[in-house]
Amino acid sequence: MAGRRGDSDEDLLKAVRLIKSLYQSNPPPSPEGTRQARRNRRRRWRERQRQIRRCSEWILDTYLGRSVDPVQLQLPPLERLTLDSSEDCGTSGTQGVGSPQVLVESPAVLESGAKE
């Protein structure tokens, strides 16, 4: 499950725990103080967040050998996408909850899998 270059789930979990602890070490700034003090705290917090993001990318790239950029997924043309309105939208009080279902013809990317 974990990865591309034979890395184990345990390696992935270690990396995730490390990245999580980095983000938890930088809580959002407090809202007290003058406007200038709050602005300075937010500025310093954003800079620390950028540093943590760079460290996280380095961990994923170096330790796990992964790129941070997602793999491009080939999507079908928009003309082939339809919304299924035959399903009930829910009972009163829950209308609009959830996501609409999208029906898609199987693109060539998905057809390369196991045949039945």
Swiss-Prot record:
Keywords on record: AIDS, Host cytoplasm, Host nucleus, Host-virus interaction, Methylation, mRNA transport, Phosphoprotein, RNA-binding, Transport
Chain positions of motif Nuclear localization signal and RNA-binding (RRE): 34-50
Entry's Gene Ontology cellular component terms: host cell cytoplasm; host cell nucleolus
One Pfam match: REV
Matching Gene3D superfamilies: 6.10.140.630
Location(s), subcellular: Host nucleus, Host nucleolus; Host cytoplasm
Sites bearing Phosphoserine, chain numbering: 8, 92, 99
Alphabetized GO MF terms: DNA-binding transcription factor activity; RNA binding
GO biological process entries: mRNA transport; viral process
Motif (Nuclear export signal and binding to XPO1): 73-84
Chief subcellular location: host cell
Biased composition (Polar residues): 88-98
PTM statement from Swiss-Prot or TrEMBL: Asymmetrically arginine dimethylated at one site by host PRMT6. Methylation impairs the RNA-binding activity and export of viral RNA from the nucleus to the cytoplasm.
Ranges of compositional bias, category Basic residues: 36-46
Stretch list, region Homomultimerization: 18-26
HAMAP family: REV_HIV1
UniProt family annotation: Belongs to the HIV-1 REV protein family.
UniProt miscellaneous comment: HIV-1 lineages are divided in three main groups, M (for Major), O (for Outlier), and N (for New, or Non-M, Non-O). The vast majority of strains found worldwide belong to the group M. Group O seems to be endemic to and largely confined to Cameroon and neighboring countries in West Central Africa, where these viruses represent a small minority of HIV-1 strains. The group N is represented by a limited number of isolates from Cameroonian persons. The group M is further subdivided in 9 clades or subtypes (A to D, F to H, J and K).
Subunit architecture: Homomultimer; when bound to the RRE. Multimeric assembly is essential for activity and may involve XPO1. Binds to human KPNB1, XPO1, TNPO1, RANBP5 and IPO7. Interacts with the viral Integrase. Interacts with human KHDRBS1. Interacts with human NAP1; this interaction decreases Rev multimerization and stimulates its activity. Interacts with human DEAD-box helicases DDX3 and DDX24; these interactions may serve for viral RNA export to the cytoplasm and packaging, respectively.
Function: Escorts unspliced or incompletely spliced viral pre-mRNAs (late transcripts) out of the nucleus of infected cells. These pre-mRNAs carry a recognition sequence called Rev responsive element (RRE) located in the env gene, that is not present in fully spliced viral mRNAs (early transcripts). This function is essential since most viral proteins are translated from unspliced or partially spliced pre-mRNAs which cannot exit the nucleus by the pathway used by fully processed cellular mRNAs. Rev itself is translated from a fully spliced mRNA that readily exits the nucleus.
Domain notes: The RNA-binding motif binds to the RRE, a 240 bp stem-and-loop structure present in incompletely spliced viral pre-mRNAs. This region also contains the NLS which mediates nuclear localization via KPNB1 binding and, when the N-terminal sequence is present, nucleolar targeting. These overlapping functions prevent Rev bound to RRE from undesirable return to the nucleus. When Rev binds the RRE, the NLS becomes masked while the NES remains accessible. The leucine-rich NES mediates binding to human XPO1.
Protein name as catalogued: Protein Rev
Species this chain originates from: Human immunodeficiency virus type 1 group M subtype B (isolate RF/HAT3) (HIV-1)
